[in-house]
Amino acid sequence: KVTDNIRLKTYLCRPMQRKFITNLALVLALNLLIKPFWILGIDRAVQNAVGTEQYGFYYAIFNFSFLLNILLDLGITNFNNKNISQNNHLLSKHFASIVLLRLLLAGIFAIVTLVGGLIIGYIPDMMKMLIAVILNQVLISFIMYLRSNLAGLHLFKTDSIISVLDRLIMIAICAVLLMKYSAPGSFQIKWFVYAQTAAYLITTAITLFIVIGKAKVRRFTWRWPFFVMILKKSYPYAVLVLLMTFYNRI
């Protein structure tokens, strides 16, 4: 009986293993196609078009906004991925409340980051850029959360496509702008930031539509005890992400 049980488990696991390997190969293939073209093609072309000063201006603001990025998630995405993969039925129960919790965290992140910008003496132009970059950070974090639901439901192919969708849209928008404004100094760095915003908004809308269809959300309600419970369960993941961030930055 023990041998039969082992054989049965092995037989049942094979399709899942095959599915995982196939989708892992798809993720790698898509990223190998898209990411190098983005980094070596579009991103490099934007740097050359706007010049070192403007790109450095953007990059400094981007790095500043990244300092408190942990506030946007607090380990929720990693916890949710594990939780939904083990309990698919919890998606419809938890999704709406987690979205509201993330909106609350996004508001805290935005306020703290903007206050930090004012404290260190950002001028109005820098604050405008910071607001756009903050929005992009919020959208990226939300996309990652939505993707954790897709992965938890084992929709690996959909997750793979979503993982490169924002880059594809950015490539299309930036390519058009770079062709139209190819003369040195004619391209503005804010267009690059807005192109990212547009790409993230479109990707968020598409992914949200897919996840809501799976979650069958009826209404969004504030559940403070639930918020506290989720944060308690997700904080170990937040600590891990924070430690990894320190490790990569130092």
Enumerate the predicted regions with their spans.
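Alpha-helical transmembrane segments of multi-pass membrane proteins
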Residues: 67, 103, 107, 111, ...
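Alpha-helical transmembrane segments of multi-pass membrane transport and lipid-handling proteins
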Residues: 33, 37, 72, 96-123, ...
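Signature of the first transmembrane helix
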Residues: 19-77, 136, 171, 235-250
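Residue-level recognition of pore/gate-forming positions within transmembrane alpha-helices
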Residues: 63-66, 102, 106, 137, ...
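Transmembrane-helix boundary and interhelical linker motifs in polytopic inner-membrane proteins
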Residues: 17-18, 46-54, 68-101, 151-157
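Membrane-interface junctions at transmembrane-helix termini in multi-pass inner-membrane proteins
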Residues: 83, 139-162
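Hydrophobic alpha-helical transmembrane segments
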Residues: 127, 131-134, 160-213
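Interhelical loop/hinge segments that connect adjacent transmembrane helices in multipass membrane
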Residues: 9-21, 185-193, 205-249
